């Protein structure tokens, strides 16, 4: 297959604007505005690509337009699948809440069925993988050229929509711990010491998403995608002057923007007295013990700088979701593997995420699992 021609900067700028619109609309009742804009953009680009296929037969052009609906359906199904997972963890979005009961029930059923079978990453990626597989057979390269950047840009903000909605929910629960007579001032010592690792987790989560997407695109026949994980990792961890292409720069900026959002949420539970109360929760102490098994030699253990970060993340993780917990632990494992810079390939940064689920379960024995229960709150 010929190398894929990725969309240029002039093509991606409008998409980036629509992503911004989408992120701004997450707390409104009208997120469909983003969906409509993206569909219109996709439709126009597909029509332009068809016109450029001068050497293709008229029947081939008709096939591309027919498959256009499949690609749109693929992109549209991603937020719905993620939304179904959001319902499972008790955080239904306003968008899903506005739909009919039958639609919500069927989405939850499909989401639950997929989650228990293959995990969160596979559940979210299945619509993209299946949709791309259905159009790759004899479809012209135009379909792939559009589908690839659309899939990447659609997937990343959608997952963070779920992540931050769950975070907000947990912050609201933690707010119940506040006594109205207590001061809510921020204790900067606790908060600032946790900033680097909190930011790192957000950025690595974004890279893990891209890594998973890259593997799945290759699995369905797309051999090249313009995202260099090593350059992104160096840019995030070492602040190197990496020459990022358009797609990489957009994803880097998106990771940074989302990490800032999570930090803003963490500020709400930064008051020292409340922070200490949260630290004593069983869910947090169990999480800390589990993390020490993953990263036993981190320098920050000695001076306690990691305590704030663990406490915040322990509070934000949904306590009743096994998949959410495993995904978080997988990311922790990714952080520890970053200490070996001469990895054989970029995907080794996320080895645990790529392992079969039965092998992952072996790493989480029943005796090692943190105890998560409603009684903590």
Swiss-Prot record:
<dbReference type="GO" id="GO:0016020">
    <property type="term" value="C:membrane"/>
</dbReference>
<feature type="transmembrane region" description="Helical">
    <location>
        <begin position="71"/>
        <end position="91"/>
    </location>
</feature>
<keyword id="KW-0812">Transmembrane</keyword>
<keyword id="KW-0472">Membrane</keyword>
<protein>
    <recommendedName>
        <fullName>Uncharacterized protein CBU_1819</fullName>
    </recommendedName>
</protein>
<keyword id="KW-1133">Transmembrane helix</keyword>
<feature type="transmembrane region" description="Helical">
    <location>
        <begin position="140"/>
        <end position="160"/>
    </location>
</feature>
């Amino acid at each position: 297959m010929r190398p894929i021609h990725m969309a240029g900067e002039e093509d991606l700028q409008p998409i980036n604007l629509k992503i911004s619109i989408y992120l701004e609309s997450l707390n409104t009742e009208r997120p469909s505005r983003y969906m409509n804009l993206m569909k219109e953009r996709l439709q126009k680009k597909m029509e332009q690509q068809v016109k450029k296929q001068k050497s293709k037969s008229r029947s081939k052009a008709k096939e591309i337009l027919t498959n256009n609906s499949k690609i749109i359906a693929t992109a549209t199904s991603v937020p719905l699948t993620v939304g179904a997972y959001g319902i499972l963890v008790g955080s239904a979005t306003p968008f899903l809440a506005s739909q009919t009961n039958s639609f919500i029930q069927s989405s939850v059923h499909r989401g639950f069925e997929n989650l228990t079978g293959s995990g969160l990453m596979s559940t979210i990626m299945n619509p993209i993988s299946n949709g791309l597989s259905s159009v790759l057979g004899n479809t012209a390269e135009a379909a792939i050229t559009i589908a690839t950047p659309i899939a990447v840009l659609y997937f990343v903000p959608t997952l963070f929509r779920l992540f931050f909605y769950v975070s907000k929910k947990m912050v609201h629960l933690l707010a119940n711990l506040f006594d109205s007579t207590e001061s809510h001032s921020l204790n900067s010592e606790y908060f600032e010491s946790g900033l680097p690792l909190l930011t790192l987790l957000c950025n690595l989560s974004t890279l893990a998403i891209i890594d998973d997407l890259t593997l799945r695109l290759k699995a369905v026949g797309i051999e090249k995608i313009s995202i260099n994980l090593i350059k992104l990792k160096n840019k995030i961890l070492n602040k190197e002057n990496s020459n990022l292409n358009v797609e990489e720069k957009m994803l880097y900026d998106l990771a940074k923007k989302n990490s800032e959002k999570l930090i803003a949420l963490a500020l709400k539970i930064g008051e020292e007295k409340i922070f200490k109360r949260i630290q004593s929760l069983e869910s947090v102490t169990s999480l800390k013990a589990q993390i020490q098994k993953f990263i036993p030699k981190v320098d920050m253990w000695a001076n306690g700088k990691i305590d704030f970060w663990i406490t915040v993340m322990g509070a934000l993780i949904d306590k009743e979701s096994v998949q959410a917990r495993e995904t978080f632990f997988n990311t922790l494992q990714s952080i520890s593997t970053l200490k070996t810079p001469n990895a054989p390939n970029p995907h080794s940064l996320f080895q645990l995420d790529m392992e079969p689920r039965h092998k992952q379960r072996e790493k989480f024995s029943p005796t090692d699992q943190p105890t998560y229960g409603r009684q903590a709150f």
